[in-house]
């Protein structure tokens, strides 16, 4: 690996920008919306039974777009019931965006929000110092387990916080996605850091099996349009390359042979589909619902 290649996570601004481009060029949020519309109502059907308040814990809530979709489904299921929504999110920038979104969203009168600027492990340490652990009716971790050092311990801890009839929802990339193939073949040639792990739903379900937890897993197809990656000097393509490889300025710093090999592979059927002249990377998501 060329020494000039460095992890995308070493430049927060660049990471946020490449992530934004990813969202703009993928069906990631539309895929999540489809799950929230079609599957979530059945999943949360009993979480608030006989309760005067529903407690929801969002781990890595980001800018809140998906969190508010979840809240609207809970409100529809339990009209008028108070909801306590606590958010654990390490990025001050994302929390600020989340608060802006809440401020301009109507129908949140019965929802109390609290934000904690910390990582899931910092939250875990803080909670364990308390004598009594707070129980939750619904806990969700959306696309965040890649940034956790000890995933089985994290799963075990948050599962222990589930109350009666409670559920935990985890969203990660599927083992059938292009990410799985990309990481297995090229992961060792990308910059290594201890901030991010290559995990898919296959790894996660194995961990859940080892922990003896009961869960269901649903896969929904999502794609990312990476056509711009194959246009030399395209700024958008450059940022999507950075996101795909988790490398800062990949096109400028990667060895030419790696860039060429990866460019060829990304157009192969196991990574992407070609449709109407576009190259659509397989971004299939897994939605894992864990029982209390």
From Swiss-Prot:
Keyword Isomerase: no
Outcome of swapping residue 60 to D: In MRT51; no effect on protein abundance; no effect on protein localization to the cytoplasm; decreased thermal stability; decreased ligand affinity for S-adenosyl-L-methionine; loss of histamine N-methyltransferase activity
Top-tier EC class: transferase
Cell compartments where the protein resides: Cytoplasm
Catalytic reaction equation(s): histamine + S-adenosyl-L-methionine = N(tau)-methylhistamine + S-adenosyl-L-homocysteine + H(+)
Keyword field: Cytoplasm, Disease variant, Intellectual disability, Methyltransferase, S-adenosyl-L-methionine, Transferase
Assembly, per entry: Monomer.
Family designation: Belongs to the class I-like SAM-binding methyltransferase superfamily. HNMT family.
Disease linkage: Intellectual developmental disorder, autosomal recessive 51: A disorder characterized by significantly below average general intellectual functioning associated with impairments in adaptive behavior and manifested during the developmental period.
Annotated protein name in UniProt: Histamine N-methyltransferase
